[in-house]
């Protein structure tokens, strides 16, 4: 099993690479790519950790050597948020980066499962899909927007509020991956209930958690460590499913049947070919249903922006 991390010299990429070096199954290969010349050195640094995961780093304009034979590609390349920016302000820079990297994936490892971490995810996933489609290699069961950070944040905040162990809580999060498009299904957590005010306040905190980190870092960056953890969780789940483990379920932002929007985050059963089944989002509370209806225009506009970036 070979996993490639693109953007591996950045804050998320280095944290992700460290976690994967420690947690990938024995015998796996990990390849790190970034435009920054430090990248082969990051790989050497990590290679001193005594786990049975082979690691190699590549830098420069060409990601091809890192991508050859990859089963899973995780893309965290791009610029980070600064105070006063929202995820869509990143669009102008990050759209071009994702387009370029996905073009290289289409040529070098078209059958790989691809997880997009680069924000704004609502839009960058649409860009990736259109690039793969143009190259004639798009498989909607193998392209994912990684929204796992919304899930782990929800688990943490719910556990804090309700005095539970964070490991005991698993909150499904649907929709998209920015602002109002993030919708935690708080009504679906077994054995936990919320007043309407609690649900509204908690939902808002989960939606704004990225901004909370950006402001707390006082201009020094955005959520890199928790995002690295989230991306590792998703990547490792994908690897386990690709290796034949049954019953692996994660929420991610994928192209589905278009019931809500062309791309939509929902619980997915993962398997040997990526998405095995898009699971139902179940019954929503009145608050959740209202939030879902209210966000769809925003989500659809984000998606359109990505489609237009490639097709116009």
Curated annotation (Swiss-Prot):
The keyword Oxidoreductase applies. CDD domains: MDH_glyoxysomal_mitochondrial. Gene3D superfamilies: Lactate dehydrogenase/glycoside hydrolase, family 4, C-terminal, NAD(P)-binding Rossmann-like Domain. It catalyses: (S)-malate + NAD(+) = oxaloacetate + NADH + H(+). GO terms for biological process: malate metabolic process; tricarboxylic acid cycle. GO terms for cellular component: cytoplasm. Substrate binds at residues 81, 87, 119, 153. The active site is at 177 (proton acceptor). InterPro entries: L-lactate/malate_DH (IPR001557), Lactate/malate_DH_C (IPR022383), Lactate/malate_DH_N (IPR001236), Lactate_DH/Glyco_Ohase_4_C (IPR015955), Malate_DH_AS (IPR001252), Malate_DH_type1 (IPR010097), Malate_DH_type1_bac (IPR023958), NAD(P)-bd_dom_sf (IPR036291). Its EC number is 1.1.1.37. NAD(+) binds at residues 7-13, 34, 94, 117-119, 227. Pfam families: Ldh_1_C, Ldh_1_N. It comes from the Bacteria. Catalyzes the reversible oxidation of malate to oxaloacetate. Belongs to the LDH/MDH superfamily. MDH type 1 family. This is Malate dehydrogenase. The lineage of its organism: Bacteria, Pseudomonadati, Pseudomonadota, Gammaproteobacteria, Enterobacterales.
């Amino acid at each position: 099993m070979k996993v490639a991390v693109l953007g591996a010299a950045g804050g998320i990429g280095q944290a992700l690479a460290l976690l994967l070096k420690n947690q990938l199954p024995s015998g796996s290969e990990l390849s790190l790519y970034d435009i920054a010349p430090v990248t082969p050195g990051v790989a050497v640094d990590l290679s001193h950790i005594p786990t049975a995961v082979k690691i190699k780093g590549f830098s420069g304009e060409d990601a091809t050597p890192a991508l050859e034979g990859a089963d899973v590609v995780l893309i965290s390349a791009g610029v980070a948020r600064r105070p006063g920016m929202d995820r869509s302000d990143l669009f102008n820079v990050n759209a071009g980066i994702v387009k370029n990297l996905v073009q290289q994936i289409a040529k070098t490892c078209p059958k790989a499962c691809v997880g997009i971490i680069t924000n704004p995810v609502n839009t960058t996933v649409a860009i990736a899909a259109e690039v793969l489609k143009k190259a004639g290699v798009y498989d909607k069961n193998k392209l994912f927007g990684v929204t796992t950070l919304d899930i782990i944040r929800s688990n943490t905040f719910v556990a804090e509020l309700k005095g539970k162990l964070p490991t005991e809580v698993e909150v499904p999060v649907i929709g998209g991956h920015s602002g109002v498009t993030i919708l935690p299904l708080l009504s679906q957590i077994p054995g936990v209930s919320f007043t309407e005010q609690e649900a509204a306040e908690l939902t808002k905190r989960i939606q704004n958690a990225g901004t909370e980190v950006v402001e707390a870092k006082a201009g020094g960056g955005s959520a890199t460590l928790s995002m690295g953890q989230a991306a590792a969780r998703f990547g490792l789940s994908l690897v386990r499913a690709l290796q034949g483990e049954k019953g692996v379920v994660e929420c991610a932002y994928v192209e589905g049947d278009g019931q809500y929007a062309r791309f939509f985050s929902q619980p997915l059963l993962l398997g040997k070919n990526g998405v095995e089944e898009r699971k139902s989002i179940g019954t929503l509370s009145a608050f959740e249903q209202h939030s879902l209806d209210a966000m769809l225009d925003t989500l659809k506009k984000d998606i359109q922006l990505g489609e237009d970036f490639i097709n116009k």
